[in-house]
C-alpha cells in the first residue's frame, strides 16, 4: 500500500499464517516475492523436513508459484521472480525444498549488483511506487462490494494472470542473455518418443 518494493521469507506454519493477507495482496495486484523453504506442517506430530504441504495449502491464494530444484536455481529464480512480479503485477511465491535445498552446501555462481540492476527495470519500480496510496492522487481501495461489482473486479484481474506465464519465460530468456544460464517454465528430460511422463517438482 505504501509503494515499497518488498520481499520476505517463510516456511511451514509461518506460511499458513500469511494466507489471509496473501488473498489481499493478490487481489490488489501488488508486486512482491515470498521465498519459501517448503516444509511439512505440524499435524499429529511436528516435522521440520522437506514437503510441499505448506505451498500447496497456499495454492488457491492467487500467487504465481515458481519452484527451484538446486541452490543455483534458488539464487537465479529469486531474481527472475522479482523481474516477473514487476512486469506482471502478480505476486510470486518462489519455493524450494526445505533442508534438502535450503540448507545445502554447494558451489553457486553469484549474481553481481550490476546483474541485479539490469533485471530490475527502474521504470517498473517507479510505476509500482506510483500505485501507492497518496493524498496527491487519491483513489478508493478495500471497499465492501455487492456480488455484481465483486465479480467484475475478480474478472478484471484475468488479463494479468493470462499474461504471467509468457512474462516469466521472457524473464528467464533475459536472464539467459545476461548469465548464459537458460531456464524454462517446464523442462523435459528423457526419450523423445516417450508415451508417458512423470511430472516432478523440486529437488
Whereabouts are the PLM-identified features?
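Conserved active-site and cofactor/substrate-binding residues in soluble primary-metabolism enzymes
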Residues: 13-20, 49-53, 60, 69-79, ...
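Beta-sheet entry/capping signal
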Residues: 5, 31-32, 91-93, 195-197
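Thiamine diphosphate
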Residues: 1-58, 63-86, 170-203
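Metal-ion/cofactor- or nucleotide/acyl-coenzyme-handling active-site neighborhoods
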Residues: 55-59, 106-109
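Conformationally flexible catalytic loops at phosphate/diphosphate-handling active centers
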Residues: 92-188
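Short, flexible coil/turn micro-motifs enriched in small/turn-prone residues
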Residues: 7-9, 137, 197
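Generic beta-strand/beta-sheet core signal
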Residues: 9, 35, 95-97, 199-202
